Every structure is written in C-alpha cells, then in structure tokens.
C-alpha cells in the first residue's frame, strides 16, 4: 500500500503490478511527472513480503519538500523532490525526516509512524465532530427552507449534530467568498446566523486557493496569483487538472503577503460576522500546484501551501474546525483539524464499497494526525437494508467525523433508527485483522465493540478468535446474538452486509 500526494490517489497491489485504489491518479489526472519504468507514490510505503514480515517506510515531516518513492518490480527509490531549486555555495538545506521500521503487526507499525509524525507536526485539536451537511441531499441548489426544515429536525431528534454546514453554491464566483450569489436570495448570512441562534454551529464551504476569471480577485489582484515560467498568471489546466466547475482555475500564492492578509481577513470575517466555526476547505491541492513560481523566491509548493494555510488558521481563530478536502495530504499536517480521506460518496453500493476501502486504509490517521472525514453517512434512497448497514458499520469503524448527508425530514423510521445509533459514535477507530478489512475491534476504555464487514455478494461464516469468553449484542438493534468461548462464529452472515456488536 502507498499514499498519494493528494487525497484522491492511493495505490495497492505489488511492486511489479501496482493497482490504483483512488480514481484520480497523480500521473494521469493531475499530470505529475513519472520517470520511465517507475510508478511514483508519495509519503508512505508499506511492504508485506509475508504477513509476519512487514516494512513501513515514510516521510515523517513535510515542511518544505515532497517525499516520493519510485517503484519498479525490483527497485524502491526513496526520493526528495527539491523542485529544481538552485543551492547556493556553502548553503545548507533541512530535508524532511524519514522513518523506517520492520515488524509483524501492521497496526503497530502505523501507530508508531503516526506518533513520530505528530511530534513533528502537532495536531490542531478539537472535540470529536458531529454534524449535518447540505451537499449530498441538495447540491448547489440548496435553499433556506431546506436548511431550516432540517435544522428543526436536528434540534428535535439529533441535538448532538453540532455543526450545520452549507456547501458550494452560495458564492457569486469562485474566489469572491464574501460576495453572495442568487442562492438564499443573497441572504446566506441570515441563514448562518439563524443556525447559531438555534444553538448550533454554522459551517461554510470555501475554496480559498482558487479563483475563476469572472471573480473580482482575478480581475483586480492578478499580482496575488502564482505565475508561470514567463511571469503570467498560471492557468491550472496548462500543468494539470483545471478544475471541476468554472474552469480553468487560477491559484492564489500563499507566499504573497497580500494573499496572506486576504486569507486572514476572509476567515476572520466568516468567524466573527457570519459566526462560522466549521470551514470546509475545498480544492486545497491547487494551493500546492506544480509548475508555478512564487512571490517569495526559492519557495517550494509545500511552503506556498503551508504559508497560506497558516494565515487561514490564524483568521479562523481558536477552536475552529478546519476540514481539508481535495487536499495535498502531507503538506496539510498540523494545519487542519479534519481531513477528507476518500472520494465523494453516493447512494450506490459500489461507491460505498470503494470509498469505504479508501477510508479504511487511512484509519490509522484518525485522532492522531487529525479527525478523519470519511464523507457523509447516507441513508436515503432504495438500496437493500443490508447495504445501508454495511455502509454505516464501515463509517463507524473509521472513527472519523460523523456527518449526516440526508434530507433528514424524508428519512423513514428504520433509517432514522440507524442514524440515532450512529450519532453516539465516540471517534474511536477499529483495528482490523488485516488489510482485507473483514473484522476489526474497537477498544474504547472499558467498552469493546466488534465490526464485521462482508464485502462479497454471498453469505459467509466468520470465525473470529477471542482471548476470553464473551457475549455479542447487535449495536443497532439491541438483539443478543449469542455467547462464545474460544472463537466467535457468525454463521451465514449475509453478503454485502455489516454490523457493529457490543462485546460483553
């Protein structure tokens, strides 16, 4: 297994035959260069010649440079990308720290790696986040009525869903985040203040590092944008992916003092005047775009991104929940409180499985580097009940932020019952038996739980070893499953099903 530079890229398989886990790879989608004959991965590389002989190699800091691995069938090259910077005679550069450890337990290796990273990049801490987001249910066409109706249901039935977050669509242009468009009849501030008045924390979607050509930022502040090799504003589609809407995007330069001041003022305004304490930052990858030149001479793309993020963190203020989405993974260390760990999820079982796998490979990061955000819990639609339980159980196992993404007013009683159990999650991650992710244990002080996932279509029997006798209770229904002495045997566990059990 190996990480990507940005959120949407992960790699599995073998050295000879690497397999893309994420849909959007660095080489094809973002057009990051690969030397002939090698697969390039980033940040973390896990090798398992046998189950009891495993290696973890990784970069445990990300202050200036990007760490890479070049892979072929018989070679692993450890690479530090210095971005063609010229090193003056007599100068010294501090490279990034490197970690390597061998062992027989995958979870222990990952936990040790996380501990070293956290020493280099202390995390921004907030309590376990629970909330609701408008995007999955309503997209960019969300209305004030949609928000108010769900707010009323949340207040009545799910008051622990503290954050109520409005997503993309409110802004006039990409880049002009305080100039609202036609949505909410131009009154998004009033909606946010209403959320606060009802006792909840307003959240907002922002893509701070990008702008489109219709924006005031682009028209009046071209000096704020990163430049190409001849000094013109860099069109992102000339070096990589140009953006998913209103493209091509241009990129704000995090090393520019004007941009830093703009970021600080923007987020301070949203915190103090709009009362937002939850900031969903999207398109963060562009803040570390390759092929750019910066205001500060000699700056790397990691430094440009981190300089910008430091200004955002300062403006957002103490206790803010800062969620990174479409983010460069390691450059975000210590500068976000939450990290998206998968592609967007849909009410579709293939999507639930695929994003679930992406999330489970990153479980080790949760509550160590940041709070993982496995995307929304989705319980609407017409899927079979077992598939919703697979999805809910998997999200519960990640220990990541719990964000409902449905129009809660339209959920049937059986789905509301699942949501009522999910909001009680405590942010504790399951440790799985292997990277097959068939079953995992959650140890939350004196409370122990077991998560079981059947990824296949057919029913199967699970044999799970235990160290002492126990009784299993279905967490979602309260039903007693049985008592077990030496191993837990779950017969005919339905295909594409999942469950969380209380272990007594």
Indicate residue ranges for each PLM-predicted region:
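Carbohydrate-recognition beta-sandwich/jelly-roll modules
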Residues: 1-162
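Solvent-exposed beta-hairpin/edge-strand motifs
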Residues: 2-10, 466-479
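Carbohydrate-binding surface patches
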Residues: 39-41, 395-398, 403, 433-468, ...
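Conserved, mostly hydrophobic/aromatic
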Residues: 90, 132, 164, 195, ...
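Aromatic-lined carbohydrate-binding/catalytic grooves of carbohydrate-active enzymes
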Residues: 128-268, 272-278, 284-295
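Glycan-recognition surfaces
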Residues: 219-261, 265, 303-410
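Aromatic- and carboxylate-lined catalytic core of secreted/periplasmic carbohydrate-active enzymes
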Residues: 392-435
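C-terminal beta-strand-rich structural cap/linker in extracellular carbohydrate-active enzymes
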Residues: 484-504
């Amino acid at each position: 297994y190996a990480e990507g530079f940005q959120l949407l890229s992960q790699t599995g398989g073998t050295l000879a035959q690497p397999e893309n886990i994420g849909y959007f790879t660095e080489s094809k989608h973002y057009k990051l260069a690969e030397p002939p004959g090698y697969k390039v991965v980033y940040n973390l590389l896990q090798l398992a010649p046998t189950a009891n002989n495993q290696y973890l190699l990784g970069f445990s800091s990300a202050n200036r440079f990007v760490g890479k691995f070049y892979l072929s069938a018989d070679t692993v090259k450890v690479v530090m990308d210095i971005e063609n910077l010229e090193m003056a005679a007599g100068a010294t550069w501090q490279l990034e720290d490197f970690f390597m450890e061998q062992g027989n337990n995958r979870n222990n290796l990952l936990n040790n790696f996380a501990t070293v990273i956290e020493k280099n990049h202390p995390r921004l801490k907030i309590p376990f986040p629970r909330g609701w987001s408008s995007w999955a249910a309503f997209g960019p066409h969300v209305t004030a009525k949609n928000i108010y109706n769900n707010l009323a249901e949340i207040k009545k039935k799910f008051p622990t869903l503290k954050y109520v977050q409005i997503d993309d669509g409110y802004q006039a242009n990409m880049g002009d985040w305080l100039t609202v468009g036609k949505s909410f009849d131009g009154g998004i501030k009033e909606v946010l203040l209403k959320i606060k008045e009802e006792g909840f924390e307003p959240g907002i979607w922002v893509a701070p590092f990008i702008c489109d050509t219709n924006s005031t930022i682009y028209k009046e502040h071209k000096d704020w944008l990163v430049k190409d090799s001849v000094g013109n504003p860099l069109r992102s589609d000339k070096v990589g992916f140009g953006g998913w809407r209103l493209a091509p995007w241009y990129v704000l330069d995090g090393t520019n003092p004007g941009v830093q001041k703009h970021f600080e003022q923007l987020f301070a305004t949203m915190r103090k005047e709009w009362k937002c304490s939850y900031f969903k930052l999207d398109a963060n990858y562009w803040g570390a775009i390759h092929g750019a030149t910066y205001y500060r001479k000699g700056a790397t793309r990691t430094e440009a991104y981190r300089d910008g993020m430091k200004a955002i963190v300062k403006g957002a203020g103490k206790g803010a929940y800062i969620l990174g989405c479409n983010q460069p993974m390691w450059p975000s260390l210590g500068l976000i409180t939450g990290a998206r760990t998968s592609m967007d999820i849909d009410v579709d079982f293939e999507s639930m499985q695929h994003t679930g796998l992406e999330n489970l490979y990153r479980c080790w990061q949760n509550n160590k580097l940041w709070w993982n955000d496995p995307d929304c819990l989705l319980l609407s639609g017409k899927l079979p009940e077992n598939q919703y339980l697979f999805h809910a159980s998997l999200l519960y196992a990640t220990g990541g932020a719990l964000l409902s993404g449905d129009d809660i007013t339209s959920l049937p009683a059986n789905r509301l019952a699942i949501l009522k159990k999910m909001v009680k999650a405590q942010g504790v991650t399951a440790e799985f038996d292997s990277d097959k992710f068939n079953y995992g244990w959650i140890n939350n002080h004196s409370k122990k739980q077991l998560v079981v996932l059947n990824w296949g279509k057919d029913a199967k029997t699970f044999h799970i070893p235990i160290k002492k006798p126990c009784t299993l209770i279905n967490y979602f229904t309260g039903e007693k499953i049985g008592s077990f002495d030496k191993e837990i045997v779950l017969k005919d566990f339905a295909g594409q099903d999942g469950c969380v059990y209380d272990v007594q």
